[in-house]
Amino acid sequence: MRLALLGHPNCGKTALFNLLTGSRQKVANYAGVTVERKEGVLTSPAGKTVRVLDLPGAYSLNALSADEAVTRDVVTGQRAGEAAPDLLVCVVDATKLQLGLRMVLEARAMGLPMVVAMNMSDAVRRQGIAIDRALLERELRMPVVETVGIRKDGASALVQWLDGWQPAGGAQASAWQPQGPAQVLQTQQEVRRILRLAVREPE
């Protein structure tokens, strides 16, 4: 099974990648560009072998940089020599949920199997912010698991979920169409709606 970690810069994605793969990783460049390619291997407690790809950080699939273009092409299966992932793990920073959910909604539109890794969930609790994970799952229509990339056991819930997940087979990304201004606005409005429902700030 191949999974790809998708997320914006500084969301804790690479820390989570290191936690999942340990020293079993290989670093190179994508062909034709000076963008780093990081892949590792996770062996789950149940013995499942998972190839983990740490995609370049991206704020949106509407690519504005070489890093974002590589990420978009890998996710959509358009990158030469790179098989499309079986599963997208969309890593979001729980303390900056608005930033991460935009990417989640963009990626969801392509119809690939997805799970959200809500990283830094411990930090958000320390701030007195309550996130209704079950409600978030319902609104996003995908599983949401809590992770803490800087803690030794911080990926245990994600690994447990991966152990129980089985690819449906035949899943292919829909063709990616860059969002126009109206679609970007619609996505932003949907993110705000979900946040109003799922997040309770301290009084």
In which residue ranges do the predicted regions lie?
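Conserved G1/Walker A P-loop phosphate-binding module
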Residues: 1-66, 78, 82, 87
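Amphipathic alpha-helical transducer elements in NTP-driven molecular machines
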Residues: 32, 36, 65-68, 72, ...
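Conserved nucleotide-binding/hydrolysis micro-motifs of P-loop NTPases
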Residues: 32, 57-60, 94-98, 120-125, ...
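Conserved C-terminal guanine-recognition region of P-loop GTPase G domains, centered on the G4
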Residues: 42-47, 70-145
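Hydrophobic alpha-helical scaffolding
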Residues: 61, 93, 148, 177-184
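Canonical P-loop GTPase G-domain recognition
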Residues: 122-176
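Cytosolic regulatory modules rich in charged/polar residues
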Residues: 167-203
